[in-house]
């Protein structure tokens, strides 16, 4: 027990704290606000408080809890809405109304709800950390696997039968090799700043299919990969994040609203329960954990929210699921680091951010990955991290953007000019990149189409060529170009408008199957080849642009039938043959 000697915003300095540990959770002041020790000097402790500190004064007590900041992991996580330190917001609302009272806490997982547990092991079985001892149908989509905590191994000496139990009840007892008996419950606690262990990290060879053509075709994200979406205000970061949360083929989605506006979290809360998961037809909320830490909540909790989210994601990864984690936005988290660092009177780095910003950012993204999990069976799980970055004024030389780009492998650059032209998703195809293209091309070629990589490269080359020609067009106008180059501009425009542009609010176009993506690209590139043949035969581009099939190609993205789209190849051929006849005469 100690007492407060100084309060500066979210930072509190307390005296007489000998015996405390770094990152220990403490209760500050008469109200018992939740805080965490972030620095120890002699018997003084510097505490970062996760709630509003107004009204706290020197002399008030500080109580240590002896535990580090931990999350509860067990049945009941899915469909929940937490704040940055895993307090369940719906329960806090029933206790204190729409605004959270200070010093309030509630258990993250319900202690009264009974879950139907089915055991998967029997007495006498040998188990190690990570082994699945039973399953609970948590939602109609996700089966929650109850695992032995990583630090326990030995022989099962007691296991309950199939039935309904609360998470507090002991469901198994394990006799360790030293004779000690360990009790296993349905939930475990885990410190958020510590990675959950695994056997082996695997290369990212499987794409995270998102149904967004720009992303899947040109700048793919791998399962277990890391991606950043930087962009100025209004360029569509949050809508892109929502699209990925809705349609990516991960089994579990963890969405962290970190320092963003409250209405953006409200959007998620209103939309997700109504939206259906394309694979199961059930509401999307049933596979989602939401962490709402909006901009009007205390700054310090932003830092915790990122770690809380990734720890929950790692827990589902350990069950063998593919998890997608959206962090919106990591800039707000970095700003929280900057504020705390400033109040600690540390030496500032670039733009006032702390000098350790790079290592903090790397530490967070490093927890992504595709892994072989702990346990005697061979499970593979992954955590894919997609972080939005909102630099002031859309400036990509911002330290947060630069430090993020050092560690992530996919960069989706959102462009305000494209957004103003109503081109969504506003991902700039000239500045974005993905370093996973070569590692996942085998998956595309074996499962979707053997020509995927060649077609992607050809389409990309056309778009690059268009940007070179744009310079000339600005100076001399399009009419001065030779016919071949006019044809390149025509086809590149088709690629942009009929392929890259995608309507997030159209029931068909919001999600595009990999097979449909490849078919659409083949139709456009087939049109390009016929166009080049026609130009060589002396047919002017104006005539080609008038072909009726062009309009049908423009509408193909709204057609759910892949066979009907493939028919356009034949139609293109027929209409070009008619052109050849007309000009041949």
UniProtKB/Swiss-Prot annotation:
GO molecular function: ATP binding; ATP hydrolysis activity; proton-transporting ATP synthase activity, rotational mechanism; proton-transporting ATPase activity, rotational mechanism
GO biological process terms held by the UniProt record: proton motive force-driven plasma membrane ATP synthesis
Main location: membrane
Top EC class of this enzyme: translocase
Membrane topology field: Peripheral membrane protein
Family: Belongs to the ATPase alpha/beta chains family.
Function: Component of the A-type ATP synthase that produces ATP from ADP in the presence of a proton gradient across the membrane. The A chain is the catalytic subunit.
UniProt name for this protein: A-type ATP synthase subunit A
UniProt organism field: Thermococcus sibiricus (strain DSM 12597 / MM 739)
């Amino acid at each position: 027990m100690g007492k407060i000697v100084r309060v500066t915003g979210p930072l509190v300095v307390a005296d007489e704290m000998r015996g405390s540990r770094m990152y220990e959770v403490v209760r500050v002041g008469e109200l018992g606000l939740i805080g965490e020790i972030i620095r120890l000097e002699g018997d003084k402790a510097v505490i970062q408080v996760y709630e509003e500190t107004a009204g706290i004064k020197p002399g008030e007590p500080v109580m240590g809890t002896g535990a580090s900041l931990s999350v509860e992991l067990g049945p009941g996580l899915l469909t929940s809405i937490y704040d940055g330190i895993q307090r369940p917001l719906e329960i806090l609302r029933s206790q204190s109304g729409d605004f959270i009272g200070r010093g309030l806490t509630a258990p993250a997982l319900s202690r009264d709800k009974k879950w139907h547990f089915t055991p998967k092991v029997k007495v006498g079985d040998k188990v190690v950390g990570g082994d699945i001892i039973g399953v609970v149908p948590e939602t109609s989509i996700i089966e929650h696997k109850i695992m032995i905590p990583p630090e326990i191994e030995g022989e099962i000496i007691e296991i309950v039968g199939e039935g309904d139990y609360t998470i507090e009840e002991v469901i198994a007892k394990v006799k360790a090799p030293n004779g000690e008996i360990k009790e296993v419950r349905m939930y475990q606690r885990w410190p958020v700043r510590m990675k959950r262990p695994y056997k082996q990290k695997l290369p990212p060879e499987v794409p995270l299919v998102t149904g967004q053509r720009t992303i899947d075709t040109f700048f793919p994200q791998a399962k277990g990969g890391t991606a950043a979406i930087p962009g100025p205000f209004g360029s569509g970061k949050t809508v892109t994040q929502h699209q990925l949360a809705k349609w990516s083929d991960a089994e579990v989605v963890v969405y962290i609203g970190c320092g963003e506006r409250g209405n953006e979290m409200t959007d998620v809360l209103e939309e997700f329960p109504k939206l259906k998961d394309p694979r199961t037809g059930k509401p999307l909320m049933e596979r989602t954990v939401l962490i709402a830490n909006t901009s009007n909540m205390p700054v310090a909790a932003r830092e915790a929210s990122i770690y809380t989210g990734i720890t929950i994601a790692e827990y589902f990864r350990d069950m063998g699921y593919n998890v997608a984690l959206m962090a919106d936005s990591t800039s707000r988290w970095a700003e929280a680091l900057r504020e705390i660092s400033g109040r600690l009177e540390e030496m500032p780095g670039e733009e006032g951010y702390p000098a350790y910003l790079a290592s903090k950012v790397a530490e967070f993204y490093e927890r992504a990955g595709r892994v072989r999990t702990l346990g005697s069976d061979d499970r593979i799980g992954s955590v894919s991290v997609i972080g939005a970055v909102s630099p002031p004024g859309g400036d990509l030389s911002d330290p947060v953007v630069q430090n993020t780009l050092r560690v992530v492998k996919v960069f989706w650059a959102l462009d305000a000019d494209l957004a103003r032209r109503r081109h969504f998703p506003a991902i700039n195809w000239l500045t974005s990149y993905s370093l996973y293209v070569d590692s996942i091309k085998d998956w595309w070629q074996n499962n979707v189409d053997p020509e995927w990589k060649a077609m992607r490269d050809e389409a990309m080359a056309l778009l690059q060529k268009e940007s070179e020609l744009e310079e000339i067009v600005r100076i001399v106008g399009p009419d001065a170009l030779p016919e071949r180059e006019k044809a390149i501009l025509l086809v590149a425009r088709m690629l942009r408008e009929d392929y890259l542009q995608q309507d997030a609010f159209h029931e068909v176009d919001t999600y595009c199957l990999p097979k449909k993506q490849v078919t659409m690209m083949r139709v456009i590139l087939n049109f390009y080849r016929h166009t080049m043949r026609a130009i060589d035969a002396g047919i002017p581009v104006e005539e080609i642009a008038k072909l009726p099939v062009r309009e049908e190609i423009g509408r193909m993205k709204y057609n759910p039938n892949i066979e009907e789209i493939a028919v356009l190849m034949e139609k293109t051929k027929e209409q070009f043959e008619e052109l050849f006849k007309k000009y041949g005469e």
